[in-house]
């Protein structure tokens, strides 16, 4: 034994104290939990993630709640029994296409609980899935605790809707929510419902799964821009973005009219956040925290400047995995018996102690290791896509949407086009005196005098698809003809998706048409702004010709759609 080791030094120190008359003071009472030696508040130690898990679960539950709320309010009109693209027709067509496959093969290719349900009342099925999701997500959001079963239920319920949602659920944030939700399953113990499950510390593998997710999201978004539209390289994209984004809000109106140098600064800042900051994740604790702060602030700016559904709120969730308990402690109250106090006590208990092996812990550790191996394996095509000069964005490589590619605004439209639906009560649609009246949607631009909407994190799926439809033809979007037919019949479900029906309290229109317009923000202080107009619009031409109910009868039957209203 070394002579300068602690065990040899202790007797010598004791002997010196006796020779000099020094005596040990009376032992002091240990400080109260959550307090320092002088009674000051104790600080949480770094390296544990008990509070991080609570914040992660609450944030994820909030996004789930919004997603299921959107589903409950809009699914019947979009994919219900008489929806614009009924999911029953979609499921039957899928079943017929794979009629030579086993039921398990069909289910594994497109997993959804709806395969196991009665299709005679699809509206009730869709409502049931959405209400279950709302109930479970509300519980997790309020309590901050969950187990693997509850989180798996949320993931399975939402995946069941995404896989039958057709184009209405084709946005990149659907897969992103499913991947985030899948990781959320492994944050929790199997059975225990506790905010601080003592024997189930937050898995480092799961935390790195979240960090790997935010790394891919941000780097993928940055690379798709640099490889995509030239305006990202010459720093001019922000000259157009606020005006041409899918659903502008009032702040976007003013940001669009910012000085040119401010737009250049925005674009450079975007490249810094998306291309350089993601690598902070691998540079130690402090750099990782800086990464999390910058990403959350960046998403907050995007929320303020546009209505991008719950995408930016969702992107904040994996960023929270950058923070440990010491970083997030300020979010929780102090005091005896508080969560922070209990975490501090748990940190003291486990410091230097070796936990006794438990069967549940062993099983969970094996599950986490398996998760890590699975994520690594499924990441191979994703990494190859990131490195490819032909990078694709918002693509999933498996039916479970576990590891996906991401990206946004790889190209920026320089002009804003809108499809305006109009109806007339005139018996002759081509008559010069036919009076055409506009239908107004809940959020997308229509009436130039209407203030842009402010709805984030909520999401109007029809309005978003109308934005995409304006860049294509109606032949590529047959659902818009279905919508026209429903407007001709004054269908209540379809009208609930709109903000204004010009024929309310009157007989339905005899004809409905689609008109193509170009929209630009009015200039602050200009003539149009003085008239109260946010937009200036100019007609491009017809989007689809005037249609009547009788003309649409064979069109509906060929697609298996129920005939609307009086037909």
UniProtKB/Swiss-Prot annotation:
Q: Which GO terms describe its cellular component?
A: endoplasmic reticulum membrane
Q: Which terms does the UniProt entry file under GO BP?
A: chylomicron remnant clearance; endoplasmic reticulum to Golgi vesicle-mediated transport; protein glycosylation; protein maturation; protein secretion; regulation of cholesterol metabolic process; regulation of triglyceride metabolic process; triglyceride metabolic process
Membrane side Lumenal: residue ranges: 73-127, 222-292, 389-567
Q: Hey, what's the signal peptide range on this chain?
A: none
Q: Where in the cell is it found?
A: Endoplasmic reticulum membrane
Question: Which ranges sit in the Cytoplasmic compartment?
Answer: 1-49, 152-207, 322-367
What topology in the membrane does the UniProt record assign? Multi-pass membrane protein
Q: Where are the transmembrane segments?
A: 50-72, 128-151, 208-221, 293-321, 368-388
Q: Which UniProt keywords apply?
A: Chaperone, Endoplasmic reticulum, Membrane, Transmembrane, Transmembrane helix
- Please list where the region (Disordered) is annotated: 1-39
Query: Pfam families annotated for this entry?
Result: LMF1, LMF1_C
Q: Mainly resides where? A: endoplasmic reticulum
For whether the record's keyword set contains Acetylation, the answer is: no
Question: What does it do?
Answer: Involved in the maturation of specific proteins in the endoplasmic reticulum. Required for maturation and transport of active lipoprotein lipase (LPL) through the secretory pathway. Each LMF1 molecule chaperones 50 or more molecules of LPL.
How does this polypeptide assemble, per the annotation?
Interacts with LPL and SEL1L.
- So what family is this one in? Belongs to the lipase maturation factor family.
Q: Which disease is it linked to?
A: Combined lipase deficiency: Characterized by repeated episodes of pancreatitis, tuberous xanthomas and lipodystrophy and is caused by deficiency of both lipoprotein lipase (LPL) and hepatic triglyceride lipase (HTGL).
Q: State the name under which the record lists this protein.
A: Lipase maturation factor 1
Q: Which gene encodes it?
A: LMF1
């Amino acid at each position: 034994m070394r002579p300068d080791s602690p065990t040899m030094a202790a007797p010598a120190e004791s002997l010196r104290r006796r020779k000099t008359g020094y005596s040990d003071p009376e032992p002091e009472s240990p400080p109260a939990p959550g307090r320092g030696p002088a009674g000051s508040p104790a600080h949480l130690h770094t390296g544990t993630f008990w509070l991080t898990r609570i914040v992660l679960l609450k944030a994820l539950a909030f996004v789930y709640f919004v997603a299921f709320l959107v589903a409950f309010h809009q699914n019947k009109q979009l994919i219900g029994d008489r929806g614009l693209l009924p999911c029953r027709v979609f499921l039957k067509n899928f079943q017929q296409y794979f009629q030579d496959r086993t039921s398990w093969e069909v289910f594994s290719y497109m997993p959804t609980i709806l395969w196991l349900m009665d299709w005679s009342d699809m509206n009730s099925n869709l409502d049931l899935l959405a209400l279950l999701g709302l109930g479970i997500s509300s519980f997790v959001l309020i309590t901050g605790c969950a187990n693997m079963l509850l989180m798996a239920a949320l993931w399975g319920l939402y995946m069941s809707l995404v896989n039958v949602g057709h184009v209405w659920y084709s946005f990149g944030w659907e897969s992103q929510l499913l991947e985030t939700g899948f990781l959320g399953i492994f944050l929790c113990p199997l059975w225990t419902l506790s905010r601080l499950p003592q024997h189930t510390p937050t898995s480092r593998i799961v935390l790195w799964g979240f960090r790997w997710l935010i790394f891919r999201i941000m780097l993928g978004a940055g690379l798709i821009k640099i490889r995509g539209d030239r305006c990202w390289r010459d720093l001019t994209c922000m000259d157009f973005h606020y005006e041409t984004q899918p659903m502008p809000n009032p702040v976007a109106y003013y940001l669009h009219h910012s000085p040119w140098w401010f737009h250049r600064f925005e674009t450079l800042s975007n490249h810094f956040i998306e291309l350089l900051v993601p690598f902070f994740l691998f540079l130690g604790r402090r750099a990782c925290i800086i990464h999390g702060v910058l990403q959350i602030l960046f998403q907050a700016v995007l929320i303020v400047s546009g209505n991008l559904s719950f995408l930016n709120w969702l992107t904040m969730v994996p960023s929270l995995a950058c923070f440990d308990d010491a970083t997030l402690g300020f979010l929780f109250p102090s005091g005896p018996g508080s969560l922070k106090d209990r975490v501090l006590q748990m940190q003291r208990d486990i410091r230097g102690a070796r936990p006794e092996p438990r069967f549940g812990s062993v099983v969970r550790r094996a599950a986490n290791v398996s998760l890590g191996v699975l994520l690594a394996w499924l990441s191979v095509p994703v990494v190859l896509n990131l490195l490819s000069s032909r990078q694709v964005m918002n693509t999933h490589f498996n039916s479970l949407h576990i590891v996906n590619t991401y990206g946004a605004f790889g190209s920026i439209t320089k002009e804003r086009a809108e499809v305006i639906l109009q109806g007339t009560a005139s018996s002759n649609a081509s008559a010069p005196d036919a009076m055409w009246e506009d239908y107004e949607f809940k959020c997308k631009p229509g009436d130039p005098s209407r203030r842009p909407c402010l709805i984030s994190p909520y999401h109007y799926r029809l309005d978003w698809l109308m934005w995409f439809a304006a860049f294509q033809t109606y032949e590529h979007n047959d659902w818009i003809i279905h919508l026209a037919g429903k407007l001709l019949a004054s269908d209540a479900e379809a009208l609930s998706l709109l903000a204004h029906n010009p024929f309310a309290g009157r007989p339905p229109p005899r004809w409905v048409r689609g008109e193509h317009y170009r929209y630009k923000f009015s200039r602050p202080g200009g003539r149009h702004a003085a008239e109260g107009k946010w937009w200036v619009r100019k007609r491009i031409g017809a989007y689809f010709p005037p249609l009547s109910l009788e003309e649409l009868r064979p069109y509906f039957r060929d697609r298996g759609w129920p005939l609307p209203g009086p037909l």
